[in-house]
Amino acid sequence: MKKRIALLPGDGIGPEVLESATDVLKSVAERFNHEFEFEYGLIGGAAIDEHHNPLPEETVAACKNADAILLGAVGGPKWDQNPSELRPEKGLLSIRKQLDLFANLRPVKVFESLSDASPLKKEYIDNVDFVIVRELTGGLYFGQPSKRYVNTEGEQEAVDTLFYKRTEIERVIREGFKMAAARKGKVTSVDKANVLESSRLWREVAEDVAQEFPDVKLEHMLVDNAAMQLIYAPNQFDVVVTENMFGDILSDEASMLTGSLGMLPSASLSSSGLHLFEPVHGSAPDIAGKGMANPFAAILSAAMLLRTSFGLEEEAKAVEDAVNKVLASGKRTRDLARSEEFSSTQAITEEVKAAIMSENTISNV
């Protein structure tokens, strides 16, 4: 198989973890006899510094010319005082909008060998395996008007708009039901229908879409209760589907069940089939260039890319099995280590690559 992958390193530790993921993809290509071509593009602060634009047209063109996109991380305090249109995060929001990346998938799974890294007791996180499906291109982050101004009495005011079309809600909820139908058959739709009109519409649409999936159970949950239930009984969930801001907050909360943001991959899906994959963690500029970054989330994002964009199930599982093998051996990055001893980003990457190349599967026995 020959495929083209757009690589967007971004800022902070983004280039380091993306290099790890790329090296792993090269090992997969070697072992399974594929050909992956890579094209780099700038995004976020790196693009602002070079082009005075968080998402240059060249980057968009490179993405549209690719079969899949792999991103590192964006942001950092260096650009915190920039106007909103010149903030690194604007690049991420813009690429989501331009490529119509409407649904973000965040798998939350606790690795057995990392159960001691979770802040929750083991009995609370046993069998935790769910996916948060977050709407990405609507809601409070994109609604208009969104501005600050001075009113007629000279006082500063600000307004943001939570706006959704029925079609925007419908397609992301349907994606959640499709996933649940292939998993454990349960969708938890999270909203704030006791207060917000947009959430009342969300709940109505969820009920309508549920009629298409008679074998999938639908439950509604208010967002404040969902935040509590993620800690109280996280193993009750299968697929959680919610709007943009709620999903942003809940997915970060859920990430701590695993013990580190550095373990969680994500995928952003488009209706065209051009999907973007990225680790959930941020750019962590304080450890950039020190070899301390955890590459597992980026590597697992590459596994999601292989499975979701290319349909390469065996190859994706080889990567995931390699990660499991390295973790089971006791190797830890700094964020996961329970002592002063830890492995560097590069050392972990080499361990994963070696595990991929050494595994015996039907295809290469």
From Swiss-Prot:
It holds the Pfam family Iso_dh. GO terms for molecular function: 3-isopropylmalate dehydrogenase activity; magnesium ion binding; NAD binding. Its EC number is 1.1.1.85. It is found in: Cytoplasm. Keywords: Amino-acid biosynthesis, Branched-chain amino acid biosynthesis, Cytoplasm, Leucine biosynthesis, Magnesium, Manganese, Metal-binding, NAD, Oxidoreductase. It catalyses: (2R,3S)-3-isopropylmalate + NAD(+) = 4-methyl-2-oxopentanoate + CO2 + NADH. Binds 1 Mg(2+) or Mn(2+) ion per subunit. One of its GO terms (cellular component) is cytosol. Its main location: cytoplasm. InterPro entries: IsoCit/isopropylmalate_DH_CS, IsoPropMal-DH-like_dom, Isopropylmalate_DH. The record marks Y141, K192 as: Important for catalysis. Pathway: Amino-acid biosynthesis; L-leucine biosynthesis; L-leucine from 3-methyl-2-oxobutanoate: step 3/4. One of its GO terms (biological process) is L-leucine biosynthetic process. Substrate binds at R96, R106, R134, D224. Its cofactor is Mg(2+); Mn(2+). NAD(+) binds at residues 76-89, 282-294. Mg(2+) binds at D224, D248, D252. Belongs to the isocitrate and isopropylmalate dehydrogenases family. LeuB type 1 subfamily. Homodimer. PANTHER family: 3-ISOPROPYLMALATE DEHYDROGENASE (PTHR42979:SF1). HAMAP family: LeuB_type1. Catalyzes the oxidation of 3-carboxy-2-hydroxy-4-methylpentanoate (3-isopropylmalate) to 3-carboxy-4-methyl-2-oxopentanoate. The product decarboxylates to 4-methyl-2 oxopentanoate. This is 3-isopropylmalate dehydrogenase. The gene is leuB.
